[in-house]
Amino acid sequence: MQTFLPYPSFAESAKCLDYKRLGKQRVEAMQIWNIVSDIQLTKGWIHHPAVTMWYGHSDALAHYTNTMIHEWKQRGYNNTMKYLPWSYPMYMHPPWLGRPEIHAAYRSNLLRKDPDYYGQFGWTEPDLSLIHIS
């Protein structure tokens, strides 16, 4: 389970994701949103770093999820997922959003997963571990 934020902008992050990761982001972000919004009370993921980083920021996560769905549809792919409700512009962004080391770690992870595809963006991050945010 993972959300990918190579950039502070949700839209910019969505636009750079490859087909495989963008498709999964819609599903995984929705699953995380269900957990942090107390809709799905599963013990399996509640302490996962990709979940804990979004606690207290369900509106921001809904915005992220909707942005992934929007980009998916913009690319012409079939989408059966519903947009999530959110309180724009009233919500607060998570405090880690915009921290350079966070976005560098995501870029590094994406480069590791698909160097040919993500190399086109000119990212130069070394092989970094993802930073766990809680």
Positions of PLM-derived features:
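Phosphate/adenylate-binding glycine loop and adjacent helical scaffold
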Residues: 1-38
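Conserved small/polar residues in nucleotide/adenosyl-binding loops
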Residues: 131-133
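Conserved, mostly hydrophobic/aromatic
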Residues: 48
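Catalytic phosphate/metal-binding cores of nucleic-acid and nucleotide-processing enzymes, i.e., regions
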Residues: 26-36, 62-65, 72, 78-102, ...
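Polybasic (Lys/Arg-rich)
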Residues: 43
